[in-house]
Amino acid sequence: MEYGALNHVAFTPGKEMLVITDLKSGRLKYYSIDGHYVKSVKLPYWFSRCEFITDNLIAGFWSGGTVIPGENKNYKPLLVVTDLLGNISSSAFQSYYRKEYTSTIFEPIRKFEDRVLYNNPNTDSIFLLTPNGIELAYHLNIKGAKPMIINEDITNDLLREQRRNNPFFNGDFVELKDGAIFHIFESGFPGYRFGIYSNAKQRTFCCDCFRYSPFFCFFDAPKARYGDNTVVVDTRSDIVLAYKDELYKLGKKEEIDEFYKDLTEDS
């Protein structure tokens, strides 16, 4: 069975299956790892992003908020934790979405190993989602930043004004085995800024854009985790080609030449 829209892809907790959030059909489509259709389950609520906390418990996000049966109709949480039958265990973070305010982030819910994490769009806090509730996992105290004020009066124009000359966390982060990395964005700033939190040191190390390793020539916002402590980024092939000589400074010419083998600007 084909899906109508590929809104989000998640693993089941044991990674036996891939699950596509298909808003066009309003269903979760289950596939085996090799791509064979397994089953389809009705979405309990209108979610554009879903991650599995357990086999029967999902965290769902919708930028317009979710109307919860039996609750105040004005309460429309961005985040809902529910079983597949629609029994809600947790919900939080009022949506202010409307014509004047449409800002969000691409991946508000992320999963690393068995930990499901949520970043409320345009804020500096990240929360851990569990069957027992929602708890603070990280709070970013960005040097020189003024906190964003997000309430019922917010508009796209007001948000842009708050972001002007103000560093902010834009939702790009990766949790690693021994820490986490967070992308910090600032309008007009010429370089890439990020913070690395160390579990062992229990402190954050900040990068202010000055690079001492050639790898940072094409380092960008973290997209995913690979293995225990490796961060995956994507960058254009022409940028990778432009910095080949910089990588030679590492002194591993044969390995670098193998890496660049068959790489072209059209790759």
What residue ranges belong to the model's regions?
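Beta-propeller blade signature
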Residues: S32-I33, N74-G86, Y192-K201, S267
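Conserved blade-ending motifs and adjacent loop-strand segments that build the rim/top face
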Residues: E135-N166, N199-D228, L241
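Short coil/turn segments that connect the beta-strands within blades of beta-propeller domains
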Residues: G14-E16, D55-N56, E113-R115, K177-D178, ...
